[in-house]
């Protein structure tokens, strides 16, 4: 059993917890949660969720600890990860999901506190290696601190890999139409660095930057410098969609591209890349554990070398499931 600690019980921290209990119960045991909020409120936020519904299990607080389905989970409220004493709960892996400790230097405080490995649930801000499960996880070589990249990179990388493997990508532009996240404002408010990002999400489509496309070059070096992209933040609570437009080296019809995606979804990328031929919309993918679901009916091509492909992702649930998958990978080495 892999013992996992979670630092930061926000959207991703809670979804990683739920995924571990629901889909990885035979492999992963959550042994500790560090968050500055009090125990009763952490239990409440785990139990009830506006997007994903009620937690399927028993949740209680006892003597300052969280009790979930009879299992005791240590709760702490430390600002500094160096004080977390992960050795006391034998943490094999710590999921760093506060969004604050995204360099080797800062995340290493978990190692100093007794954790064996650390997964950042966001792109690293330094040279910490990034992994996308299903795309480059087999190249993991025992590093004690890794990044699970972003939810958007986890959606984009599988389809980019299939396109490049089968047809070759000369260059490409990505747009993600992205659901709202916790950093956004419900009404207009101050945002010094990103003025547009300070506008209210309830009534705006907000153009934003994203490093997700460039990050694909880190998990697939063959595509380094060939992709870039942007985001539109939209007034939905969950599920986002990647629109990737590429110039291909080899000529390909949309039927051939669809066939390549379907083959990959049933083969090497099964469980990571999904495939649909249905007339779907975003809420149809809420709760889907695949990180990228290719929409065969949404893609278009201008000619045999210029095509647009579309892939959906539950930016909370799909991503969090792959954090758990990567925890299994790094705990095994």
From Swiss-Prot:
Q: Which domain of life is it from?
A: Bacteria
Q: In which pathway does it act?
A: Carbohydrate degradation; glycolysis; pyruvate from D-glyceraldehyde 3-phosphate: step 1/5
Residues that coordinate or bind D-glyceraldehyde 3-phosphate: 150-152, 181, 210-211, 233
Site for Activates thiol group during catalysis, residues? 178
Q: What is its EC number?
A: 1.2.1.12
Q: Which CDD domains match?
A: GAPDH_I_C, GAPDH_I_N
Locate the active site: 151 (nucleophile)
Q: Which InterPro entries match?
A: GlycerAld/Erythrose_P_DH, GlycerAld_3-P_DH_AS, GlycerAld_3-P_DH_cat, GlycerAld_3-P_DH_NAD(P)-bd, Glyceraldehyde-3-P_DH_1, NAD(P)-bd_dom_sf
Instruction: Quote the SUPFAM superfamilies the UniProt record gives.
Output: Glyceraldehyde-3-phosphate dehydrogenase-like, C-terminal domain, NAD(P)-binding Rossmann-fold domains
Q: Give the main EC class.
A: oxidoreductase
Question: Sorted alphabetically, which keywords does the UniProt record give?
Answer: Cytoplasm, Glycolysis, NAD, Nucleotide-binding, Oxidoreductase
Q: Does the keyword Iron apply?
A: no
| Gene3D superfamilies for the chain | Dihydrodipicolinate Reductase, domain 2, NAD(P)-binding Rossmann-like Domain
Q: Where in the cell is it found?
A: Cytoplasm
Q: Which GO terms describe its cellular component?
A: cytoplasm
Which sites bind NAD(+)?
11-12, 35, 79, 121, 315
Where is the major localization of this protein? cytoplasm
Q: Which reaction does it catalyse?
A: D-glyceraldehyde 3-phosphate + phosphate + NAD(+) = (2R)-3-phospho-glyceroyl phosphate + NADH + H(+)
Picking any one GO molecular function of the record gives: glyceraldehyde-3-phosphate dehydrogenase (NAD+) (phosphorylating) activity
Q: Which GO terms describe its biological process?
A: glucose metabolic process; glycolytic process
Q: How does it assemble?
A: Homotetramer.
Give the function comment from the record: Catalyzes the oxidative phosphorylation of glyceraldehyde 3-phosphate (G3P) to 1,3-bisphosphoglycerate (BPG) using the cofactor NAD. The first reaction step involves the formation of a hemiacetal intermediate between G3P and a cysteine residue, and this hemiacetal intermediate is then oxidized to a thioester, with concomitant reduction of NAD to NADH. The reduced NADH is then exchanged with the second NAD, and the thioester is attacked by a nucleophilic inorganic phosphate to produce BPG.
**Protein name per UniProt:** Glyceraldehyde-3-phosphate dehydrogenase
């Amino acid at each position: 059993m892999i013992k996992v600690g979670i630092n930061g019980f926000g959207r991703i921290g809670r979804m990683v917890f739920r995924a571990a209990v629901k889909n990885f119960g035979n492999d992963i045991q959550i042994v500790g949660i560090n968050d500055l909020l009090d125990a009763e409120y952490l239990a409440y936020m785990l139990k009830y969720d506006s997007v994903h519904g009620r937690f399927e299990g028993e949740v209680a607080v006892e003597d300052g600890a969280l009790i979930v389905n009879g299992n005791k989970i240590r709760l702490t409220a430390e600002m500094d990860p160096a004080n977390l004493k992960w050795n006391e709960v034998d943490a094999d892996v710590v999921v760093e999901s506060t969004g604050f400790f995204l360099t080797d230097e800062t995340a290493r405080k978990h190692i100093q506190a007794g954790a064996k490995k650390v997964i950042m649930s966001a792109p690293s801000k330094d040279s910490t290696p990034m992994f996308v499960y299903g795309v480059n996880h087999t190249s993991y070589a025992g590093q004690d601190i890794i990044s699970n990249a972003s939810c958007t990179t986890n959606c984009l990388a599988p389809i980019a890999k299939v396109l490049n493997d089968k047809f070759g990508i000369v260059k490409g532009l990505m747009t993600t139409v992205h659901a709202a996240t916790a950093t956004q404002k419900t009404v207009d408010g101050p945002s010094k660095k990103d003025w547009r990002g300070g506008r209210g999400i309830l009534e705006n489509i907000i153009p934003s930057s994203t490093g997700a496309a460039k990050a694909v070059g880190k998990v697939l070096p063959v595509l380094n410098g060939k992709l870039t992209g942007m985001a539109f933040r939209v007034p939905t609570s969950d599920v986002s969609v990647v629109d990737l437009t590429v110039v291909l080296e080899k000529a390909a019809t949309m039927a051939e591209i669809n066939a390549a995606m379907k083959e990959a979804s049933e083969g090497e990328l099964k469980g990571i890349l999904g495939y649909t031929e249905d007339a779907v919309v975003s809420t149809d993918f809420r709760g889907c554990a695949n990180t990228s679901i290719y929409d065969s009916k949404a893609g278009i091509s201008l000619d045999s070398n210029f095509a647009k492909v579309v892939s959906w992702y539950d930016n909370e649930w799909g991503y969090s499931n792959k954090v758990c998958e990567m925890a299994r990978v790094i705990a095994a080495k």
